[in-house]
């Protein structure tokens, strides 16, 4: 049964194990997700099931909103509370104005170094596997965009602060908090993290999951196709279609069937979901 859902991941479980538990509970044959959350983190995951898993690579394009807690005065191996403390700073007292000033300095396009304990790959090997073996290596910086950052609270007695941040795909909040600590001439690690929104998608407080329509989450222009056009595309044929040169999501009514590209007013399929097309064309033959 194909489906795209928004799920709320719980704490202390990997994203992979969380969605596989969901798959077994609901009886899906296949499941996939985008936008991995660390075991420590909670919050939203976009999940696709059965034949809709073929859409996964195209679902994780939106900015994400997080609420995080940063603990001041310490650095850990993993940049979060699950790591071993390796450095300490006594410079942990700041005014709210200073915190806001430093947070605001991160708004905009910037470069970020991913944490070594991450799923980034180096020569095909996960960075966290290399880090656990104490192998020395360097990751490449990535470009990120922070569109909003807001101080929510500051506990001066316990030396932590909470903030909300809206970031582009691929941003590591652990690394952001580490960088904030450095810019404060201190140290900091991530104590907790919740992903509260993906684009404009969110769950109400009493919701743990919600079924999504593909049109809500695909950040591409949409082309609505007729059955005869779908049949031609399934045969590898090109379709004359006047439109701007671009990459498009292909739909039959409310059903997303794949992706295509228009060049010089000619549409060529790039990825099609065979089972959906078989059903659509089967319905055509029965008409």
Curated annotation (Swiss-Prot):
Pfam families: TruB_N. The active site is at 38 (nucleophile). Its EC number is 5.4.99.25. It comes from the Bacteria. One of its GO terms (biological process) is tRNA pseudouridine synthesis. GO terms for molecular function: RNA binding; tRNA pseudouridine(55) synthase activity. SUPFAM superfamilies: Pseudouridine synthase (SSF55120). The keyword Transmembrane helix does not apply. Keywords: Isomerase, tRNA processing. It catalyses: uridine(55) in tRNA = pseudouridine(55) in tRNA. Signal peptide: none annotated. Belongs to the pseudouridine synthase TruB family. Type 1 subfamily. Responsible for synthesis of pseudouridine from uracil-55 in the psi GC loop of transfer RNAs. NCBIfam families: TruB. This is tRNA pseudouridine synthase B. It comes from Mycoplasma mobile (strain ATCC 43663 / 163K / NCTC 11711) (Mesomycoplasma mobile).
